[in-house]
From Swiss-Prot:
Coiled coil: none annotated. Residues 263-303 are annotated as: Disordered. The keyword Zinc applies. ATP binds at residues 49-56. This is Zinc import ATP-binding protein ZnuC. GO terms for biological process: response to zinc ion. The gene is znuC. PANTHER family: METAL TRANSPORT SYSTEM ATP-BINDING PROTEIN TM_0124-RELATED (PTHR42734), ZINC IMPORT ATP-BINDING PROTEIN ZNUC (PTHR42734:SF9). The complex is composed of two ATP-binding proteins (ZnuC), two transmembrane proteins (ZnuB) and a solute-binding protein (ZnuA). It is an enzyme of class 7 (translocase). It catalyses: Zn(2+)(out) + ATP(in) + H2O(in) = Zn(2+)(in) + ADP(in) + phosphate(in) + H(+)(in). Part of the ABC transporter complex ZnuABC involved in zinc import. Responsible for energy coupling to the transport system. SUPFAM superfamilies: P-loop containing nucleoside triphosphate hydrolases. The keyword Cell membrane applies.
Length: 303
């Protein structure tokens, strides 16, 4: 198993990566602008937002895959990053074992390989062919591959995409156990605007900029939810309440309080009377359901 590496109690962990007023411009259009957040050792930060809101772009800027056009990104010296992409292109007609998957980007000591697979709960599948794995098992294999080289920061792009509800619970429990065992920081990207991993320390809602941020509210307080999905789900998932002055439309555009509609919103676009700086506010609008994943590929980088 992986050995714990936690920050001593009472000492605030130094950020592994921090973004300050980051903007990424492509073809004359800002994909994201004015993005600020940080991830520290042992911390779980979840980025949520509709399709095309800049979640993957912000994560890539954080780990250095994309260079921001404005603002700055600071990373801990010698930062090691483990990355689980949203989509991994594999020719499923070719034989590929879990063992081979683990070493695609370079050799890996057998001990470290087995330790990572054991942490992911699939050590018994070392010689299994990946095309025979279920969606949840394949995600576990990708997580094992990401943690095998003992990263400081683990970036998970839509880790529960394509997995059924019970599989989501299992994978979120796995992410929690990885964080607890290693003390690594975790940057998690989710397309679900309302339900997030309960262990999340900070939720950041993006739609071209940081719309709002806060902490999740545990769904375990809802007897109806427990009756529907069970106590384990209630302990693993949490509801995040948004608190901003605009509505995310189903197509990803933004409807402002004055009724105007734009592709994205930004604090300096003239539509915002003020920005909220803390969680727990009520608001007078709802988010339509955006629970459909986007399909663009993510660039891959491993520790």
């Amino acid at each position: 198993m992986l050995s714990p590496a936690k920050t001593p109690a009472g000492i605030r962990a130094e950020p592994l990566v921090s973004l300050e007023n980051v903007g990424v411009l492509r073809n004359g259009r800002w994909l994201v602008r004015g993005v600020d957040f940080s991830v520290s050792r042992g911390e779980i930060v979840t980025l949520i937002g509709p399709n095309g809101s800049g979640k993957s772009t912000s994560a890539k800027a954080a780990i250095g895959v994309l260079k921001p056009d404005e603002g700055r990104v600071e990373r801990k010296a010698g930062l090691k990053v483990g990355y689980v992409p949203q989509k991994l292109s594999i020719d499923w007609t070719l034989p590929l074992s879990v063992r081979r998957l683990m070493t695609l980007t370079g050799p890996l000591p057998e001990r470290d390989m087995l330790s990572a697979l054991e942490s992911a709960g699939i050590a018994h599948m070392l010689d299994a062919e990946v095309q025979h794995l279920s969606g949840g098992e394949f995600q576990r294999a990708l997580m094992a591959r990401a943690i095998a080289r003992k990263p400081d920061l683990l970036v998970l792009d839509e880790p529960v995409q394509g997995v059924d509800f019970s599989g989501e619970i299992v994978l979120y429990d796995l992410i929690k156990s990885i964080r607890n065992a290693t003390g690594c920081g975790i940057l998690l990207i989710s397309h679900d605007l309302h339900v997030v991993m309960a262990e999340t320390d900070t939720v950041i809602c993006l739609n071209g900029h940081v719309c709002c941020r806060g902490t999740p509210e545990s769904v375990s307080r809802s007897p109806e939810y427990v009756r529907l999905f069970g106590s384990r789900a209630a302990q693993t998932l949490a509801v995040y309440s948004h608190h901003h002055d605009h509505t995310h439309l189903p197509d990803g555009r933004v409807q402002h309080a004055d009724g105007t509609v734009t592709d994205h919103c930004h604090p300096d676009d003239g539509h915002h009377a003020h920005e909220h700086g803390h969680a727990g506010h009520e608001h007078d609008h709802d988010h339509p359901d955006h629970a459909h994943p986007h399909a663009h590929e993510a660039g891959e980088r491993h520790a």
